[in-house]
Every structure is written in structure tokens, then in C-alpha cells.
């Protein structure tokens, strides 16, 4: 009998579920996604998106089992209209708290970046953490 190598499950669905439940309270239903499309935010006054940048193996054992990975995510926050600058940072703050609650640390940002539509303010933050298959408060 051949033992199958154990791998750490990709956390993208868990992270998106927790992040989206928090961010929806700030930006509204349907104003967030996992899409990297640059046009989704153009017709909205508040919008946020998250996407995985990678999930490389961090540790493995001699049998080939994957013991931990380092998932990395980017979160883009968008706001348009009056007080867009303060609003975009408020969206980023809600997102940041959701990511930190899952054990992620901000590795970049929050940085205000130029957007193709100058009426839309955009803030980018990136996060990573060591992941062993469980987020905080999950049972093994």
C-alpha cells in the first residue's frame, strides 16, 4: 500500500468567506469580489476586491508531506464621490481588521495608488501568513 502525501488545503475559499462577510457591511451587497478586473469598480461608489497572489510551500517533511504554506493576498479598496479619500481608507480599515482576525499580517500598504479613472480613489494592501490548514477559531 502506498501512502498518499498530505498537502495543506488552499485557504482561498475560507479567507474569501470570512473577508466578504465583513466587507459587505461596509461596501454593500454585490460591491466586492475575487475578480482582478479593472472595470468592476467603475460604476460603484464603494467597492473592494481580494485575490490570492500565491500559496507556496513553506515546510515539508521527509516523506513529502506539505506541513505549511504561505498564502498571500492583495486587497484593493475603491471609493468614488464626496469624501472618497477618507472613505477608501475606511474600507481598507474594515478589510484590514478582517485579515488580521484570520492571522494575516500586512506586508504592503495601505498605499494610495493611481487609478485609470481619476475620480476613483484606490488603496492597496497585501497580506501573508504561515498557514497549516487552519485559521484562528477553527478546530482540527
Label each PLM-derived region with a short phrase.
Residues 1-61:
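Small/polar-rich, solvent-exposed N-terminal microdomains that initiate assembly or binding
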Residues 42-44, 65-69, 117-121:
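A generic structural micro-feature
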Residues 64-68, 90-93, 139-140:
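Short intrinsically disordered coil segments
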Residues 14, 18, 90-97:
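Long, highly charged amphipathic alpha-helices
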Residues 82-90, 136:
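Short, conserved charged micro-motifs
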Residues 67-81, 121-132:
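Oligomerization/assembly interface segments of phage tail-like spikes and tubes
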Residues 55, 81-82:
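Short Gly/Pro-enriched loop/turn and capping motifs at secondary-structure junctions
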Residues 93-140:
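Acidic-leaning, charged glycine-interspersed low-complexity segments
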Amino acid at each position: 500500500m502506498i501512502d498518499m502525501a498530505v498537502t495543506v488545503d488552499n485557504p482561498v475559499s475560507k479567507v474569501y468567506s470570512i473577508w466578504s462577510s465583513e466587507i459587505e457591511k461596509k461596501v454593500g451587497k454585490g460591491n466586492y469580489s475575487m475578480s482582478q478586473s479593472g472595470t468592476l469598480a467603475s460604476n460603484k461608489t464603494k467597492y473592494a476586491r481580494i485575490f490570492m497572489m500565491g500559496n507556496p510551500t513553506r515546510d515539508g517533511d521527509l516523506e513529502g508531506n506539505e506541513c505549511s504554506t504561505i498564502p498571500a493576498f492583495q486587497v484593493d479598496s475603491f471609493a468614488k464621490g464626496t469624501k472618497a479619500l477618507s472613505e477608501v481608507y475606511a474600507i481598507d480599515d474594515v478589510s484590514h481588521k478582517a485579515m488580521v482576525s484570520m492571522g494575516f499580517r500586512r506586508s504592503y500598504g495601505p498605499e494610495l495608488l493611481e487609478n485609470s479613472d481619476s475620480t476613483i480613489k484606490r488603496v492597496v494592501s497585501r497580506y501573508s501568513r504561515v498557514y497549516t490548514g487552519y485559521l484562528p477559531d477553527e478546530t482540527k
